[in-house]
Amino acid sequence: RHYYASRGLGDVYKRQDDPVWHEQIFLQQKVLGGILGVEDCWLTMRGLKTMGLRMEQSVRSAEKISQMLEQHPAVKKVNYPGLKSHPGYEIQKQQASSGGAVLSFELADQEAVFAFAEALKIPIAAVSLGGVESILSYPVTMSHACVPKEEREKQGVTDGLLRLSVGIEDTADLLADLTQALAKVEEKIEK
């Protein structure tokens, strides 16, 4: 998603000094045509030129969003390695310069999730579109739809869990949108 800044169609892998691996890749390319087309290569190069700027904005927003969510009474839990409350915070500090642009958080239940998602205006509901927009996904009906409830809950994927991949929109706009959507959740809880 972050390489392209568009809806490009490839992945980048780099592995050196492994002739067996190189032979396998060469065979795959020969048989399946695994080489990106000219336009896909151009999109990748274009995306890499602005990746630093896009990541700075996404990370800055993700940090502020995670802090806001952690303080909000309608949110049960926030999973973001850039928060001091995260169990992996110290390791993350040693390994990375930020907590990244993806976080998850938990609301009370599926009803709260639906009220929240319905009220949102900015994030797109999807698994991934490969663009620069913020994307909200609901693992229960998306990535983990085929996983039995008992197994999914063992993995921490509850009926109230949402995943937010933060895009490059204005931080204040994202915070305002998320806050107003959480207010709708609180209204629903009070009823």
Regions found by a protein language model. Give the residues of each.
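Glycine-rich beta-alpha junction loops
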Residues: 50, 65, 82-86, 107-109, ...
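Single conserved hydrophobic/aromatic residue that forms the stacking wall/gate
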Residues: 1-13
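Conserved core segment of the aminotransferase class I/II
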Residues: 14-73, 117-120
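PLP-dependent enzyme catalytic core of the Aspartate aminotransferase-like
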Residues: 54, 111, 118, 134-191
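Conserved small-domain helix->loop->beta segment predominantly found in fold-type I
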Residues: 63-121, 127, 148-153
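Beta-strand segments within the central parallel beta-sheet cores of soluble alpha/beta enzyme folds
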Residues: 24-28, 77-82, 162
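Short, well-ordered beta-strand elements within core beta-sheets of diverse protein domains
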Residues: 43-53, 100-108, 163-167
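Short, flexible turn/loop "capping" segments at secondary-structure junctions
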Residues: 36, 40, 94-97, 154-159
